[in-house]
Amino acid sequence: MFGVSRGAFPSATTQPFGSTGSTFGGQQQQQQPVANTSAFGLSQQTNTTQAPAFGNFGNQTSNSPFGMSGSTTANGTPFGQSQLTNNNASGSIFGGMGNNTALSAGSASVVPNSTAGTSIKPFTTFEEKDPTTGVINVFQSITCMPEYRNFSFEELRFQDYQAGRKFGTSQNGTGTTFNNPQGTTNTGFGIMGNNNSTTSATTGGLFGQKPATGMFGTGTGSGGGFGSGATNSTGLFGSSTNLSGNSAFGANKPATSGGLFGNTTNNPTNGTNNTGLFGQQNSNTNGGLFGQQQNSFGANNVSNGGAFGQVNRGAFPQQQTQQGSGGIFGQSNANANGGAFGQQQGTGALFGAKPASGGLFGQSAGSKAFGMNTNPTGTTGGLFGQTNQQQSGGGLFGQQQNSNAGGLFGQNNQSQNQSGLFGQQNSSNAFGQPQQQGGLFGSKPAGGLFGQQQGASTFASGNAQNNSIFGQNNQQQQSTGGLFGQQNNQSQSQPGGLFGQTNQNNNQPFGQNGLQQPQQNNSLFGAKPTGFGNTSLFSNSTTNQSNGISGNNLQQQSGGLFQNKQQPASGGLFGSKPSNTVGGGLFGNNQVANQNNPASTSGGLFGSKPATGSLFGGTNSTAPNASSGGIFGSNNASNTAATTNSTGLFGNKPVGAGASTSAGGLFGNNNNSSLNNSNGSTGLFGSNNTSQSTNAGGLFQNNTSTNTSGGGLFSQPSQSMAQSQNALQQQQQQQRLQIQNNNPYGTNELFSKATVTNTVSYPIQPSATKIKADERKKASLTNAYKMIPKTLFTAKLKTNNSVMDKAQIKVDPKLSISIDKKNNQIAISNQQEENLDESILKASELLFNPDKRSFKNLINNRKMLIASEEKNNGSQNNDMNFKSKSEEQETILGKPKMDEKETANGGERMVLSSKNDGEDSATKHHSRNMDEENKENVADLQKQEYSEDDKKAVFADVAEKDASFINENYYISPSLDTLSSYSLLQLRKVPHLVVGHKSYGKIEFLEPVDLAGIPLTSLGGVIITFEPKTCIIYANLPNRPKRGEGINVRARITCFNCYPVDKSTRKPIKDPNHQLVKRHIERLKKNPNSKFESYDADSGTYVFIVNHAAEQT
């Protein structure tokens, strides 16, 4: 490819691109005087000055690569345009006319003294101190300089254009397209104001070349490629072309420097030898682009290196007839010149290696890429400093290089004295295959890049005796394997392929073998006799033959990387192998039935093996030694001599009679039939059904064996232990029964020390207990209200008290307090001071009474009693006048005068007087003498003063309806005497029944009521209860009559003193036109289940009708 002398494809006559000239500036052979074509078909001149790479660069007589003439005529532009002969206007590369006329500003006139532009002073930053802040400001604008501050940027640019300073400063004040000085030279393209004069100044062209304008600014008298001058001017990149030895990229011809990248071409006139592509020395047979000879791509029929140091054969591997040298990475070169990376050569190497020194990385010219020395007398070090002598120097990682020391991975080295990169001997390559002069990856003598022979072509199309780049060899000489290990000759010693296939003739890339060779070697993934202890990288050793990636091994082999000992042979990756007894495959069992191998073997990953169990299946071998079951299957070995066997993960194992120890499967029992096996275990979930002497039960199943064994985890024990366990349980139960009489909770320690509370062993007591909120301060009624201290002396009642005498009632302390438990009210009348505290203490009985409604009345009555006692203390008005019931009735019938007094319960106590002296009792109203606090507390209980007409009307109505008072302040009509005279039938239908309270209101039943089952005295105060602005029927009685029964009939209810109260004065509002009164009436009309009848604003009387009295409040 790079340095062979054949054509592109197997052809013996043509060059790679149809040319026989130099490739990239290579020197033509002096023995070829005929005219040759260039690389692209351009005809070469026959003079002694040879053409460079493309026949144009620096050549005065060759054709231009793009059709332009390479002669010294004046019309040699690259694209065919003719150059002008005018000295002041020569043509550019694209035919543009160049001139020396400066840019003009159109019709604008130039002001005087304005052509200085920016040439007065070079640009510098202008600094100025800020007077306010004291900070120095640095201005990066040229218009801030004092020399140019009168001009703007555009003005300065215009002045520079007028002065011809458009492209920067030069010696003559003009510039070129790419800022090269243009004085009198021709610039690159001639269209941007450049001067295309044809003077012979010494300035360069487009890239700094001489002024002769060529293709890109070269002179008209030459045809250089990129502006190289024809005479005494530079070449393509500025090199001088006045001599006849220059190369394509500007190397000086008479010097000994390089050509394209520093190499020099030979000067046939003086016989000077120059360097190669990258500066390496070139002998008489110099290299081409990369050090090869000067044919098409460095191909030469002589024995020199190619592109990478290989023998100069054709572009592609056509057959060669000579033995070549080493390949690209240190392979040995048979001739004087080496390859690219450290190969031997007569002159300097690729990167400047000296003739007698090391290669690319400092190794000697005779050594290999990584320090492998093939010269027995060399004393220089390898790549990493190892000595390449015959002495026992270490390898890359310090291993010994003699025959007694191992390699990098512990393999024994052969009898060679020195090893390579990984400890292998120099007779083998980097991975252990033997060689005489190996390449980088262990190629055989004088191999190529990937192990091919040095005489081989690039892509395995060569017909020489050596291998190609991928190792296939079409000859019958001894050669080595290629990249993937296949071998293309019929030599007796060949390495294996990449995946273990043998390298015979007609081999395919992945191990299929076409011929039978007596001895072969493995390659990268195949076993090798010298690399790593006769094993391959992935465990296959091929002392005789190698396996394929999915094929069969036909010979005995040793174990490799993954532990399988390949003693006669190893199985394929997915299949078995027809050779002797070996290890199982990855997914299958080993189908070998060799009985001569007594060694132990192991099962495959998913299948069984001859002697050992596979990963998922039992073993099927007949080996006499130990074998194990697969991971999912049993061990199916039928050998009776097996000493140790194990079942599979999920299955049992039918081990023979000679097994001594066997374990059950994970989910199955152990079906061992061995008579000598004294110890067997059951499966995880199954019982042990063997007849062994000692067995354990499964996890969830009992042990059904006849011998002594343990039960399962969640099951009953076996029959052999039933009697002993039953006896033990009976004994324990008897002991528990003896103690159970004393402790009803058994003998468990959890309950033996437990204490039983009284709530468990004793009946439930009443839950009502005395509440103790705080032991230090008891919450009682006596603490809430301050008790009145007793007086030291009490006044006795006068015996001549007319009132008491008339009433003829003795003062009884028991009558001073009246407690009505059914009505939950306490009425405190006139009592002595010594009994007041006792009365309050008795009232605490109702403190936690669930039937009570409120203590508001109690508190208000007590306060009113205290105020009344203080007001009436010492007066006779404090006495109470009592009359008999008959006298009271007579007084009502006679309509005597009535006096009213305010009593302790807040109501009006009517005193029936027998005096007929006409004294007006209306003037004896008592004003309330209470403080402001008492007024607020009893605002709703304040007695409203009736007019004399109202009082007379109330009592006249009671007297006319045959009414009588019951309990306290309650009256009933008909009276009790009348109702007592009714028969039972009459009591079932009592018409016009009225029950009322003298202060709060009354109820009139509009339908007959049934009083047969109702105590008459309990109608007022118990069944029917009046409170301020409230009438309650069956307040605390759960059993109410049904509709139409008892007193649950239609009725009219009248409530007294239902005034709206003014919040500012706390007084009732009696004005009918007041807004609050109107609002109050509207609210009364909205009461549910009632029919509004009337409201009197003066008296505060509210009258409404209900359909069912017992269901309303």
UniProtKB/Swiss-Prot annotation:
Boundaries of every Peptidase S59 domain copy: 967-1109
- Keyword Hydrolase present in the record's keywords: the answer is no
What GO terms describe the biological role, i.e. biological process, of this protein? mRNA export from nucleus; nuclear pore organization; nucleocytoplasmic transport; poly(A)+ mRNA export from nucleus; post-transcriptional tethering of RNA polymerase II gene DNA at nuclear periphery; protein import into nucleus; ribosomal large subunit export from nucleus; RNA export from nucleus
Q: Which Pfam families match?
A: Nucleoporin2, Nucleoporin_FG
Q: Which InterPro entries match?
A: Nucleoporin_FG_rpt (IPR025574), Nucleoporin_S59-like (IPR037665), Nup98_auto-Pept-S59_dom (IPR007230), Nup98_auto-Pept-S59_dom_sf (IPR036903)
- What top-level branch of life does the organism fall under? Eukaryota
User: Where is the protein found, in the record's own terms?
Assistant: Nucleus, Nuclear pore complex; Nucleus membrane
The segments labelled Interaction with KAP95, not MEX67 in the record are 536-732
Segment forming the signal sequence? none
> How does the record comment on the protein's domains?
Contains FG repeats. FG repeats are interaction sites for karyopherins (importins, exportins) and form probably an affinity gradient, guiding the transport proteins unidirectionally with their cargo through the NPC. FG repeat regions are highly flexible and lack ordered secondary structure. The overall conservation of FG repeats regarding exact sequence, spacing, and repeat unit length is limited.
Please state what the protein is called: Nucleoporin NUP116/NSP116
